[in-house]
């Protein structure tokens, strides 16, 4: 009762009863005592010194493993990586494990619970209230953290309004456990292009994002999302995928129906950039990618097919590629059974595109589209997908650390274990440079000097 009363008092100050309910639900779901939760959420004081003893360290800078390294933490930051712990110091012993920087997932949806078919999506928008979805979202945020993702970029609430802003803020205020979050609030698309679709014209149904038409309305929508707390702007640039032969022998081109006009896209990108907000574009195929690159977005999401000329432009302009491989494989069978067999063809096309992107020198950031698959599935499966598609384990790890931090503009704070950066540390048994699948078994997670998993 005391915890509920305290939570109610604090949340009323923030005018958000939803966050309070979500906090209580997340605590109960985790099966932790309130005392343990309080200890784990305590913000590290500036003078608190802790030492983490690692059997091996991959610091995210050189990717050359160093053996028997002790990391000194002061408050929520790393102080040094070459200082022995004095007698009587607080030491977390990970001498049997490999330590590495907290991981970064640059494409998530904490407010989705799996989206294989249209029915899966419709159910969540029609039968789950925004409040209920927010509660589930707080649990998913905690799962992301315990999987080892200490930072995520959540790219759209899919009909849950601005709940991502509340979750982000509650995490930042240590009300609930979760990763650092950059959020995109409501994504943007044109009328008639995004679910819910196919209902009778006289039936009013919710939509998974904000519908906008015309350059002026597009600018207004960007301003609205920023005013409600968006760190990023998310746009949907294509739909209606189909395959046809390309100009080269054996080439398959994944084509599409573009959504926004180039003028509309340019208006949104210009407005976002004027207000110091980057833009992520859902662009799966030929035209959506090309228009997004021409408009100057900051990242291409999915990119199952990207023409060579656009890959060259992305490399030249510094546009990031967030491929989300695993989710495409996860949903393909279900969507094919629903009447869209193109999703089965897209797997091979995606692999071919990924290999060309690597060769072209495009910056590739790790992103999973978690929420597109159930959050009980470990998003770290994406690492194995990236290696199977042609990356080395080191490249895959770099995509989820240094490259991810650069995409998010957080390279001064995260992405490596070095003095001055946040004490975001994860640990695994085994060597992820030899077998990236060990990242699916992370058993120690620290964010900002606070232990959320393991290390007792």
Language-model features: locations:
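Bacterial N-terminal signal peptides
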Residues: 16-27
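Histidine-rich, glycine-flanked metal-binding segment
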Residues: 36-37, 42-48, 57, 62-100
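Metal-associated gating/positioning segment near the N- to mid-region
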Residues: 97-175, 191-194, 198-201, 295
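Active-site gating loops and adjacent loop-to-helix segments of metal-dependent hydrolytic enzymes
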Residues: 111-133, 191-206, 241-259, 316-347
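Histidine/acidic-residue-rich catalytic or RNA/ligand-binding cores of hydrolases
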Residues: 115-117, 164, 193, 244-246, ...
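His/Asp/Glu-enriched, well-ordered alpha-helical/loop segment
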Residues: 123, 274-278, 346-432
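Divalent metal-dependent hydrolysis catalytic cores, especially in the metallo-beta-lactamase
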Residues: 136-163, 177-187, 230-240, 278, ...
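Histidine/acidic residue-rich metal-binding segments in metalloenzymes
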Residues: 214-237, 242-321, 345-364
């Amino acid at each position: 009762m005391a915890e509920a009363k305290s939570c109610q008092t604090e949340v009323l100050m923030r005018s958000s009863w939803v966050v309070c309910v979500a906090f209580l639900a997340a605590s109960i779901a985790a099966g932790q005592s309130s005392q343990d939760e309080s200890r784990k959420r305590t913000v590290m004081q500036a003078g608190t010194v802790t030492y983490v003893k690692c059997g091996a360290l991959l610091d995210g800078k050189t990717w050359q493993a160093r053996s028997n390294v002790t990391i000194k933490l002061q408050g929520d930051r790393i102080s040094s990586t070459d200082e022995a712990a004095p007698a009587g110091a607080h030491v977390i012993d990970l001498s049997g494990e490999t330590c590495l920087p907290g991981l970064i997932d640059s494409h998530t949806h904490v407010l989705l619970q799996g989206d294989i078919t249209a029915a899966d999506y419709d159910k969540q928008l029609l039968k789950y209230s925004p409040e209920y979805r927010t509660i589930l979202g707080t649990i998913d945020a905690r799962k992301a953290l315990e999987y080892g993702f200490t930072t995520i970029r959540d790219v759209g609430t899919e009909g849950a309004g601005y709940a991502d802003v509340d979750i982000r803020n509650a995490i930042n205020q240590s009300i609930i456990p979760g990763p650092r979050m950059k959020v995109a609030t409501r994504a943007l698309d044109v009328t008639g292009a995004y679910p819910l679709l196919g209902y009778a014209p006289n039936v009013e149904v919710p939509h998974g994002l904000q519908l906008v038409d015309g350059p002026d309305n597009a600018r207004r929508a960007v301003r609205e999302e920023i005013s409600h707390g968006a760190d990023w702007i998310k746009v949907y640039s294509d739909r209606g995928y189909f395959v046809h032969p390309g100009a080269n022998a054996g080439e398959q081109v994944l084509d599409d129906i573009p959504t926004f006009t180039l003028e509309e896209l340019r208006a949104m990108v210009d407005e976002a950039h004027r207000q110091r907000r980057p833009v992520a574009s859902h662009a799966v195929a030929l035209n959506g990618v090309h228009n997004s690159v021409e408009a100057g977005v900051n990242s291409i999401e999915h990119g199952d097919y990207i023409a060579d000329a656009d890959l060259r432009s992305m490399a030249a302009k510094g546009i990031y590629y967030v491929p989300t491989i695993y989710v495409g494989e996860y949903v393909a069978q279900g969507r094919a059974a629903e009447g869209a067999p193109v999703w089965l063809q897209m797997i091979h096309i995606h692999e071919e595109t990924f290999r060309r992107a690597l060769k072209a020198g495009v910056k590739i950031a790790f992103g999973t589209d978690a929420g597109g698959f159930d959050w009980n599935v470990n998003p770290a499966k994406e690492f194995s997908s990236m290696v199977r598609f042609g990356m080395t384990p080191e490249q895959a790890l770099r995509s989820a650390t240094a490259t991810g931090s650069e995409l998010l503009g957080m390279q001064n704070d995260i992405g490596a274990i070095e003095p001055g950066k946040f004490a975001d540390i994860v640990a695994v048994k085994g060597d992820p440079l030899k077998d990236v699948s060990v990242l699916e078994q992370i058993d120690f997670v620290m964010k900002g000097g606070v232990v959320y998993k393991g290390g007792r």
